[in-house]
Amino acid sequence: MNRREFSKNVLMLGIGAQAGFGQGNPAGTRNQPTNYYEEPAKKLPVRKFDVVVAGGGTAGVVAATAAARQGAKTALIEVKGYPGGTVTEGGTALHSFYNLWKAFPGVKKRQVVRGIPQEIIDRLMKVGGTSGHAEMSKGYDFDSVCTAIDTEIYKLVTFEMLVEAGVFVCVNTLLAGAIMDGSRIKGVIAESRSGREAFYAKCFVDCTAYGDLSAYAGADYTEPNDYPVVNSIGVANVSIDKYYKFLKSHDAIYQQAEGWRSGKDGQIVRIQGRTVKLPAGFREEAAKIGMSTVTTTVHDNYFMFIKLNLNMPVSPTNRDEVAKAELELRKRQAKAIELFREYVPGCEKAFIARTNPKICIRRGRLITCDYDISHEDVIEGRHFDDDVLTYGFHDSAPSYQIKDGGTYGIPYRALRVAGVQNLLAAGMLITSDHRAHMSTRNTVSCMGQGQATGTAAALCAATNCGTRELRYRDLRKALVNGGVYFES
Protein backbone atom coordinates (compact mmCIF):
# COMPACT_ATOMS: atom_id res chain seq x y z
CA MET A 1 0.00 0.00 0.00
CA ASN A 2 1.36 3.46 -0.88
CA ARG A 3 1.05 6.82 0.83
CA ARG A 4 -1.78 8.09 -1.35
CA GLU A 5 -3.97 5.05 -0.73
CA PHE A 6 -3.33 5.02 3.00
CA SER A 7 -3.83 8.77 3.43
CA LYS A 8 -7.11 8.64 1.53
CA ASN A 9 -8.37 5.83 3.72
CA VAL A 10 -7.41 7.32 7.08
CA LEU A 11 -9.20 10.55 6.28
CA MET A 12 -12.51 8.71 5.77
CA LEU A 13 -14.60 7.96 8.81
CA GLY A 14 -17.19 5.25 8.33
CA ILE A 15 -20.37 4.77 10.27
CA GLY A 16 -19.81 1.66 12.42
CA ALA A 17 -22.17 -1.06 13.53
CA GLN A 18 -24.66 -0.14 16.23
CA ALA A 19 -24.06 -3.23 18.39
CA GLY A 20 -21.84 -6.30 18.61
CA PHE A 21 -18.69 -6.68 16.53
CA GLY A 22 -18.49 -4.31 13.59
CA GLN A 23 -18.44 -5.70 10.09
CA GLY A 24 -16.66 -2.77 8.47
CA ASN A 25 -12.93 -2.63 7.76
CA PRO A 26 -10.50 -0.09 9.17
CA ALA A 27 -8.43 2.42 7.27
CA GLY A 28 -6.09 0.80 4.81
CA THR A 29 -8.23 -2.24 3.94
CA ARG A 30 -10.75 -3.15 1.28
CA ASN A 31 -14.55 -2.74 1.37
CA GLN A 32 -14.56 0.78 2.72
CA PRO A 33 -17.87 2.17 4.01
CA THR A 34 -19.78 4.52 1.73
CA ASN A 35 -20.90 7.13 4.27
CA TYR A 36 -18.43 9.76 5.45
CA TYR A 37 -18.07 12.80 7.63
CA GLU A 38 -15.56 15.44 6.56
CA GLU A 39 -13.71 16.95 9.49
CA PRO A 40 -13.34 20.73 9.42
CA ALA A 41 -9.82 22.14 9.37
CA LYS A 42 -8.52 23.63 12.59
CA LYS A 43 -5.33 25.14 13.96
CA LEU A 44 -3.21 22.94 16.19
CA PRO A 45 -0.66 24.07 18.78
CA VAL A 46 2.88 23.13 17.76
CA ARG A 47 5.66 21.70 19.91
CA LYS A 48 9.18 21.59 18.47
CA PHE A 49 11.80 18.91 19.11
CA ASP A 50 14.96 17.49 17.61
CA VAL A 51 13.73 13.90 17.78
CA VAL A 52 10.29 12.36 18.17
CA VAL A 53 10.00 8.68 19.05
CA ALA A 54 6.61 7.14 18.33
CA GLY A 55 5.86 4.24 20.64
CA GLY A 56 7.23 3.76 24.15
CA GLY A 57 7.50 -0.01 24.12
CA THR A 58 10.47 -2.35 24.13
CA ALA A 59 12.44 -0.42 21.49
CA GLY A 60 10.96 3.03 22.08
CA VAL A 61 12.04 3.35 25.70
CA VAL A 62 15.65 2.76 24.74
CA ALA A 63 15.46 4.88 21.58
CA ALA A 64 14.13 7.92 23.43
CA THR A 65 16.62 7.53 26.27
CA ALA A 66 19.51 7.21 23.81
CA ALA A 67 18.43 10.24 21.78
CA ALA A 68 18.08 12.43 24.85
CA ARG A 69 21.43 11.34 26.26
CA GLN A 70 22.99 12.26 22.94
CA GLY A 71 21.82 15.82 23.56
CA ALA A 72 18.68 15.87 21.42
CA LYS A 73 15.51 17.53 22.61
CA THR A 74 13.36 14.40 22.54
CA ALA A 75 9.68 13.57 22.82
CA LEU A 76 8.20 10.11 23.32
CA ILE A 77 4.59 9.45 22.32
CA GLU A 78 3.02 6.38 23.95
CA VAL A 79 -0.64 5.37 23.78
CA LYS A 80 -0.69 3.57 27.14
CA GLY A 81 -0.05 5.07 30.55
CA TYR A 82 3.38 3.49 30.99
CA PRO A 83 6.44 2.45 28.97
CA GLY A 84 7.61 -1.09 28.37
CA GLY A 85 5.47 -2.65 25.64
CA THR A 86 5.92 -6.35 24.94
CA VAL A 87 8.52 -6.69 27.69
CA THR A 88 5.78 -6.03 30.23
CA GLU A 89 2.91 -7.69 28.39
CA GLY A 90 3.71 -10.53 26.02
CA GLY A 91 7.15 -11.96 26.69
CA THR A 92 8.22 -14.73 29.03
CA ALA A 93 11.71 -13.33 29.63
CA LEU A 94 14.19 -11.04 27.90
CA HIS A 95 15.85 -12.97 25.05
CA SER A 96 18.82 -12.71 24.98
CA PHE A 97 21.79 -10.70 26.10
CA TYR A 98 24.23 -13.55 25.34
CA ASN A 99 25.26 -15.85 22.54
CA LEU A 100 24.14 -19.50 22.59
CA TRP A 101 27.45 -20.72 23.98
CA LYS A 102 26.10 -23.53 26.17
CA ALA A 103 24.80 -25.46 23.16
CA PHE A 104 28.25 -25.43 21.54
CA PRO A 105 31.00 -26.90 23.76
CA GLY A 106 34.16 -24.84 23.62
CA VAL A 107 32.44 -21.67 22.41
CA LYS A 108 33.22 -18.62 24.51
CA LYS A 109 30.46 -17.13 26.64
CA ARG A 110 30.01 -13.47 25.82
CA GLN A 111 27.45 -10.81 26.54
CA VAL A 112 26.69 -9.29 23.16
CA VAL A 113 23.98 -6.77 24.07
CA ARG A 114 25.08 -4.15 26.57
CA GLY A 115 24.65 -0.37 26.76
CA ILE A 116 21.27 0.99 27.84
CA PRO A 117 19.55 -2.44 27.81
CA GLN A 118 22.07 -3.71 30.37
CA GLU A 119 21.68 -0.52 32.40
CA ILE A 120 17.98 -1.29 32.71
CA ILE A 121 18.85 -4.73 34.11
CA ASP A 122 21.36 -3.22 36.54
CA ARG A 123 18.72 -0.88 37.89
CA LEU A 124 16.15 -3.66 38.13
CA MET A 125 18.63 -5.75 40.12
CA LYS A 126 18.93 -3.03 42.74
CA VAL A 127 15.19 -3.15 43.47
CA GLY A 128 14.53 -6.88 43.11
CA GLY A 129 12.98 -6.55 39.69
CA THR A 130 14.94 -9.22 37.80
CA SER A 131 16.44 -12.67 38.10
CA GLY A 132 19.64 -11.33 36.62
CA HIS A 133 21.19 -13.20 33.71
CA ALA A 134 20.26 -16.68 34.92
CA GLU A 135 22.01 -19.51 33.08
CA MET A 136 19.80 -22.26 31.70
CA SER A 137 20.56 -25.62 33.34
CA LYS A 138 18.13 -27.39 30.99
CA GLY A 139 16.96 -26.37 27.54
CA TYR A 140 20.12 -24.44 26.79
CA ASP A 141 19.92 -25.48 23.16
CA PHE A 142 17.15 -22.84 23.04
CA ASP A 143 18.84 -20.10 25.05
CA SER A 144 21.88 -20.05 27.29
CA VAL A 145 20.51 -17.36 29.59
CA CYS A 146 17.11 -16.38 30.91
CA THR A 147 16.61 -12.81 32.11
CA ALA A 148 13.27 -12.74 33.93
CA ILE A 149 11.77 -9.44 35.07
CA ASP A 150 9.01 -8.03 37.24
CA THR A 151 6.71 -6.29 34.78
CA GLU A 152 5.52 -3.56 37.13
CA ILE A 153 8.98 -2.66 38.39
CA TYR A 154 10.18 -2.56 34.78
CA LYS A 155 7.54 0.06 33.97
CA LEU A 156 8.69 2.24 36.86
CA VAL A 157 12.43 1.89 36.24
CA THR A 158 12.19 2.71 32.53
CA PHE A 159 9.82 5.62 33.18
CA GLU A 160 12.34 7.05 35.65
CA MET A 161 15.18 6.62 33.18
CA LEU A 162 13.26 8.52 30.50
CA VAL A 163 12.56 11.42 32.83
CA GLU A 164 16.15 11.48 34.10
CA ALA A 165 17.41 11.66 30.52
CA GLY A 166 15.22 14.70 29.89
CA VAL A 167 12.69 13.06 27.56
CA PHE A 168 9.33 14.82 27.19
CA VAL A 169 7.21 11.77 27.98
CA CYS A 170 3.69 11.83 26.54
CA VAL A 171 1.80 8.82 27.85
CA ASN A 172 -1.91 8.24 27.26
CA THR A 173 -1.28 9.93 23.93
CA LEU A 174 -2.32 8.60 20.53
CA LEU A 175 -0.26 9.06 17.38
CA ALA A 176 -2.89 10.30 14.92
CA GLY A 177 -1.06 11.26 11.74
CA ALA A 178 2.04 12.55 9.99
CA ILE A 179 2.65 15.98 8.49
CA MET A 180 4.64 15.49 5.31
CA ASP A 181 6.83 17.79 3.26
CA GLY A 182 7.48 15.67 0.19
CA SER A 183 9.38 12.59 1.34
CA ARG A 184 10.33 14.21 4.62
CA ILE A 185 8.31 14.14 7.84
CA LYS A 186 7.79 17.65 9.12
CA GLY A 187 5.83 16.60 12.17
CA VAL A 188 3.31 14.23 13.66
CA ILE A 189 -0.15 14.77 15.09
CA ALA A 190 -0.86 13.48 18.58
CA GLU A 191 -4.08 13.39 20.55
CA SER A 192 -4.67 13.17 24.27
CA ARG A 193 -7.17 14.50 26.78
CA SER A 194 -5.08 17.66 26.74
CA GLY A 195 -6.07 18.13 23.12
CA ARG A 196 -4.78 17.62 19.62
CA GLU A 197 -1.23 18.84 18.96
CA ALA A 198 1.45 18.88 16.28
CA PHE A 199 4.95 17.73 17.17
CA TYR A 200 7.61 19.04 14.78
CA ALA A 201 11.06 17.46 14.72
CA LYS A 202 14.12 16.99 12.57
CA CYS A 203 14.20 13.20 12.81
CA PHE A 204 11.69 10.52 13.80
CA VAL A 205 11.82 6.93 15.03
CA ASP A 206 8.95 4.48 14.52
CA CYS A 207 8.80 2.14 17.51
CA THR A 208 5.04 1.57 17.36
CA ALA A 209 5.44 -2.20 16.79
CA TYR A 210 2.84 -2.14 14.01
CA GLY A 211 4.44 0.59 11.92
CA ASP A 212 1.83 3.29 12.51
CA LEU A 213 4.15 6.23 11.90
CA SER A 214 5.69 4.67 8.81
CA ALA A 215 2.24 4.06 7.35
CA TYR A 216 1.14 7.62 8.10
CA ALA A 217 4.32 8.85 6.39
CA GLY A 218 3.52 6.89 3.25
CA ALA A 219 6.17 4.21 3.54
CA ASP A 220 5.61 0.96 1.71
CA TYR A 221 4.53 -1.98 3.82
CA THR A 222 2.86 -5.37 3.75
CA GLU A 223 0.88 -7.30 6.35
CA PRO A 224 2.16 -10.89 6.43
CA ASN A 225 -0.31 -11.95 9.15
CA ASP A 226 1.92 -14.96 9.85
CA TYR A 227 1.79 -15.31 13.64
CA PRO A 228 -0.79 -16.47 16.16
CA VAL A 229 -2.40 -13.98 18.49
CA VAL A 230 -0.81 -14.03 21.94
CA ASN A 231 -1.77 -12.86 25.39
CA SER A 232 -0.31 -13.61 28.78
CA ILE A 233 -1.46 -13.45 32.36
CA GLY A 234 0.23 -13.09 35.71
CA VAL A 235 -0.96 -15.74 38.17
CA ALA A 236 -0.76 -15.20 41.94
CA ASN A 237 -1.15 -17.40 45.02
CA VAL A 238 0.93 -20.20 43.50
CA SER A 239 4.15 -22.06 44.27
CA ILE A 240 6.74 -22.31 41.53
CA ASP A 241 8.63 -24.92 43.55
CA LYS A 242 5.55 -27.16 43.67
CA TYR A 243 4.98 -26.53 39.96
CA TYR A 244 8.54 -27.71 39.39
CA LYS A 245 7.88 -30.87 41.41
CA PHE A 246 4.67 -31.47 39.44
CA LEU A 247 6.54 -31.30 36.13
CA LYS A 248 9.42 -33.38 37.46
CA SER A 249 7.06 -36.08 38.74
CA HIS A 250 5.98 -36.62 35.14
CA ASP A 251 9.55 -36.44 33.80
CA ALA A 252 8.38 -33.44 31.80
CA ILE A 253 10.95 -30.73 32.48
CA TYR A 254 12.36 -29.26 29.26
CA GLN A 255 13.68 -25.84 30.30
CA GLN A 256 15.01 -24.71 33.65
CA ALA A 257 17.02 -21.74 34.89
CA GLU A 258 18.10 -20.63 38.35
CA GLY A 259 18.70 -17.05 39.44
CA TRP A 260 17.52 -14.38 41.87
CA ARG A 261 14.01 -14.85 43.26
CA SER A 262 12.51 -13.14 46.30
CA GLY A 263 15.95 -11.95 47.39
CA LYS A 264 17.72 -15.32 47.13
CA ASP A 265 20.04 -16.55 44.39
CA GLY A 266 20.00 -20.06 42.94
CA GLN A 267 16.21 -20.27 42.79
CA ILE A 268 14.14 -21.49 39.84
CA VAL A 269 13.16 -18.47 37.74
CA ARG A 270 12.18 -20.17 34.49
CA ILE A 271 10.62 -23.54 33.88
CA GLN A 272 8.88 -25.26 31.01
CA GLY A 273 7.43 -28.74 30.74
CA ARG A 274 6.88 -31.05 27.81
CA THR A 275 3.10 -30.98 27.63
CA VAL A 276 2.94 -34.39 25.95
CA LYS A 277 4.12 -36.02 29.20
CA LEU A 278 1.55 -34.37 31.45
CA PRO A 279 -1.81 -35.85 32.55
CA ALA A 280 -4.25 -36.27 29.69
CA GLY A 281 -6.84 -33.89 31.10
CA PHE A 282 -4.30 -31.09 31.54
CA ARG A 283 -2.61 -31.81 28.22
CA GLU A 284 -5.78 -31.88 26.16
CA GLU A 285 -7.35 -28.77 27.66
CA ALA A 286 -4.06 -26.83 27.46
CA ALA A 287 -3.88 -27.65 23.75
CA LYS A 288 -7.42 -26.41 23.20
CA ILE A 289 -6.61 -22.99 24.66
CA GLY A 290 -3.08 -22.74 23.25
CA MET A 291 -1.51 -22.60 26.71
CA SER A 292 2.22 -23.06 27.09
CA THR A 293 3.67 -24.62 30.23
CA VAL A 294 6.52 -22.11 30.31
CA THR A 295 6.63 -19.52 33.05
CA THR A 296 9.16 -17.13 34.56
CA THR A 297 9.14 -15.32 37.85
CA VAL A 298 11.19 -13.32 40.33
CA HIS A 299 8.77 -14.02 43.21
CA ASP A 300 8.10 -17.20 45.19
CA ASN A 301 4.31 -17.08 44.89
CA TYR A 302 3.77 -15.61 41.45
CA PHE A 303 3.94 -16.79 37.85
CA MET A 304 4.92 -13.64 35.96
CA PHE A 305 3.85 -15.04 32.59
CA ILE A 306 1.47 -17.78 31.51
CA LYS A 307 1.19 -17.52 27.74
CA LEU A 308 -1.80 -18.36 25.55
CA ASN A 309 -1.81 -18.55 21.76
CA LEU A 310 -4.80 -18.18 19.48
CA ASN A 311 -4.57 -19.39 15.89
CA MET A 312 -7.04 -17.22 14.08
CA PRO A 313 -6.48 -14.74 11.23
CA VAL A 314 -6.19 -11.38 12.94
CA SER A 315 -4.67 -8.18 11.62
CA PRO A 316 -3.72 -5.71 14.36
CA THR A 317 -4.87 -2.95 12.02
CA ASN A 318 -8.41 -4.37 11.92
CA ARG A 319 -10.29 -3.21 15.00
CA ASP A 320 -13.14 -5.70 14.64
CA GLU A 321 -10.95 -8.76 14.14
CA VAL A 322 -8.93 -7.72 17.18
CA ALA A 323 -12.09 -7.37 19.29
CA LYS A 324 -13.07 -10.97 18.56
CA ALA A 325 -9.58 -12.17 19.48
CA GLU A 326 -9.59 -10.12 22.70
CA LEU A 327 -12.80 -11.81 23.85
CA GLU A 328 -11.66 -15.30 22.95
CA LEU A 329 -8.36 -14.87 24.78
CA ARG A 330 -10.13 -13.58 27.90
CA LYS A 331 -12.17 -16.79 27.92
CA ARG A 332 -8.98 -18.82 27.56
CA GLN A 333 -7.36 -16.99 30.45
CA ALA A 334 -10.19 -18.07 32.73
CA LYS A 335 -9.83 -21.66 31.55
CA ALA A 336 -6.08 -21.59 32.18
CA ILE A 337 -6.64 -20.73 35.83
CA GLU A 338 -9.11 -23.61 36.13
CA LEU A 339 -6.47 -26.00 34.81
CA PHE A 340 -3.83 -24.88 37.29
CA ARG A 341 -6.27 -25.09 40.19
CA GLU A 342 -7.35 -28.60 39.23
CA TYR A 343 -4.06 -30.24 38.30
CA VAL A 344 -1.07 -28.42 39.81
CA PRO A 345 -0.26 -28.72 43.54
CA GLY A 346 0.27 -25.36 45.19
CA CYS A 347 -2.08 -23.67 42.73
CA GLU A 348 -5.41 -24.69 44.27
CA LYS A 349 -6.27 -21.08 45.08
CA ALA A 350 -4.52 -19.42 42.15
CA PHE A 351 -6.04 -16.32 40.60
CA ILE A 352 -5.30 -13.91 37.76
CA ALA A 353 -3.35 -10.94 39.10
CA ARG A 354 -2.41 -9.33 35.79
CA THR A 355 -3.75 -9.24 32.27
CA ASN A 356 -2.48 -7.35 29.27
CA PRO A 357 -4.27 -4.18 28.17
CA LYS A 358 -4.39 -5.63 24.67
CA ILE A 359 -3.49 -8.69 22.64
CA CYS A 360 0.00 -9.09 21.24
CA ILE A 361 0.56 -10.01 17.62
CA ARG A 362 4.23 -10.56 16.89
CA ARG A 363 4.02 -8.77 13.58
CA GLY A 364 1.55 -6.31 12.09
CA ARG A 365 2.77 -4.07 9.30
CA LEU A 366 6.11 -5.06 7.83
CA ILE A 367 7.83 -1.81 6.89
CA THR A 368 10.08 -1.71 3.84
CA CYS A 369 13.58 -0.57 4.81
CA ASP A 370 16.76 0.01 2.82
CA TYR A 371 17.98 -3.50 3.63
CA ASP A 372 16.03 -6.64 4.47
CA ILE A 373 17.81 -9.07 6.78
CA SER A 374 17.65 -12.62 5.40
CA HIS A 375 17.52 -15.85 7.32
CA GLU A 376 20.89 -16.75 5.85
CA ASP A 377 22.28 -13.52 7.31
CA VAL A 378 21.08 -14.68 10.72
CA ILE A 379 22.03 -18.36 10.83
CA GLU A 380 25.32 -17.89 8.98
CA GLY A 381 26.34 -15.24 11.50
CA ARG A 382 26.94 -12.48 8.99
CA HIS A 383 28.19 -9.07 10.00
CA PHE A 384 28.09 -5.90 7.93
CA ASP A 385 30.22 -2.83 7.41
CA ASP A 386 27.47 -0.72 9.01
CA ASP A 387 26.57 -2.94 11.99
CA VAL A 388 24.78 -1.14 14.81
CA LEU A 389 23.90 -4.18 16.90
CA THR A 390 25.36 -7.61 17.62
CA TYR A 391 22.83 -10.32 18.45
CA GLY A 392 22.92 -14.05 19.14
CA PHE A 393 19.43 -15.49 19.82
CA HIS A 394 16.94 -17.30 17.60
CA ASP A 395 13.43 -18.06 18.89
CA SER A 396 13.20 -21.16 16.70
CA ALA A 397 16.17 -22.83 18.39
CA PRO A 398 17.12 -25.61 18.43
CA SER A 399 15.56 -26.01 14.97
CA TYR A 400 17.47 -22.92 13.83
CA GLN A 401 20.62 -21.76 15.56
CA ILE A 402 23.21 -19.17 14.68
CA LYS A 403 26.29 -20.88 13.30
CA ASP A 404 28.72 -22.18 15.94
CA GLY A 405 26.95 -20.38 18.77
CA GLY A 406 28.00 -17.08 17.27
CA THR A 407 26.31 -13.80 16.45
CA TYR A 408 25.13 -11.75 13.51
CA GLY A 409 24.93 -8.03 12.94
CA ILE A 410 21.96 -5.79 12.28
CA PRO A 411 23.10 -3.13 9.80
CA TYR A 412 22.09 0.50 10.09
CA ARG A 413 20.50 0.42 6.65
CA ALA A 414 18.05 -2.27 7.86
CA LEU A 415 16.60 0.36 10.21
CA ARG A 416 16.20 3.16 7.64
CA VAL A 417 12.64 3.36 6.33
CA ALA A 418 12.70 3.31 2.54
CA GLY A 419 11.34 6.37 0.77
CA VAL A 420 11.32 8.66 3.80
CA GLN A 421 14.28 10.98 4.38
CA ASN A 422 14.19 11.31 8.15
CA LEU A 423 12.55 8.19 9.54
CA LEU A 424 14.10 5.19 11.27
CA ALA A 425 12.36 2.05 12.51
CA ALA A 426 13.11 -0.28 15.40
CA GLY A 427 11.38 -3.38 16.71
CA MET A 428 9.23 -6.11 15.25
CA LEU A 429 8.20 -4.03 12.23
CA ILE A 430 11.38 -4.88 10.27
CA THR A 431 12.57 -8.09 8.50
CA SER A 432 10.32 -9.82 5.96
CA ASP A 433 11.57 -13.43 6.15
CA HIS A 434 9.52 -15.12 8.87
CA ARG A 435 12.45 -17.27 9.98
CA ALA A 436 14.78 -14.27 10.27
CA HIS A 437 12.02 -12.31 12.01
CA MET A 438 11.91 -15.08 14.63
CA SER A 439 15.27 -13.65 15.71
CA THR A 440 15.14 -9.92 15.02
CA ARG A 441 11.75 -9.39 16.71
CA ASN A 442 12.86 -10.62 20.14
CA THR A 443 12.90 -8.21 23.05
CA VAL A 444 16.63 -7.73 23.56
CA SER A 445 17.14 -7.28 19.82
CA CYS A 446 14.43 -4.61 19.85
CA MET A 447 16.11 -2.89 22.79
CA GLY A 448 19.42 -2.83 20.93
CA GLN A 449 17.73 -1.53 17.79
CA GLY A 450 16.24 1.19 19.96
CA GLN A 451 19.63 2.39 21.15
CA ALA A 452 20.93 2.38 17.58
CA THR A 453 18.02 4.34 16.10
CA GLY A 454 17.73 6.80 18.96
CA THR A 455 21.44 7.56 18.76
CA ALA A 456 21.31 7.90 14.97
CA ALA A 457 18.26 10.16 15.09
CA ALA A 458 19.98 12.48 17.54
CA LEU A 459 23.09 12.69 15.37
CA CYS A 460 20.98 13.39 12.28
CA ALA A 461 19.18 16.17 14.11
CA ALA A 462 22.43 17.67 15.39
CA THR A 463 23.97 17.79 11.92
CA ASN A 464 20.74 18.61 10.04
CA CYS A 465 21.17 15.61 7.75
CA GLY A 466 18.90 12.86 6.53
CA THR A 467 19.23 9.32 7.79
CA ARG A 468 21.19 8.30 4.68
CA GLU A 469 23.65 11.17 4.93
CA LEU A 470 24.74 10.31 8.47
CA ARG A 471 28.38 9.17 8.54
CA TYR A 472 28.60 5.65 9.87
CA ARG A 473 31.87 6.28 11.68
CA ASP A 474 30.18 9.00 13.73
CA LEU A 475 27.29 6.69 14.58
CA ARG A 476 29.55 3.83 15.55
CA LYS A 477 31.68 6.05 17.77
CA ALA A 478 28.58 7.31 19.58
CA LEU A 479 27.28 3.76 20.04
CA VAL A 480 30.60 2.55 21.43
CA ASN A 481 30.60 5.49 23.83
CA GLY A 482 27.10 4.38 24.84
CA GLY A 483 28.35 0.92 25.79
CA VAL A 484 27.30 -0.97 22.64
CA TYR A 485 29.30 -4.12 21.91
CA PHE A 486 30.58 -4.93 18.42
CA GLU A 487 32.11 -8.17 17.17
CA SER A 488 33.21 -6.80 13.83
Model regions and ranges:
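Flavin (FAD/FMN)-binding glycine-rich loop and adjacent Rossmann-like elements that form
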Residues: 38, 42, 86-88, 128, ...
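N-terminal Rossmann-fold NAD(P) dinucleotide-binding loop
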Residues: 60
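Beta1/beta-strand and adjacent pyrophosphate-binding region of the FAD-binding site
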Residues: 46-57
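A short, basic/flexible loop-to-alpha-helix module at the beginning of a structural domain
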Residues: 33-48
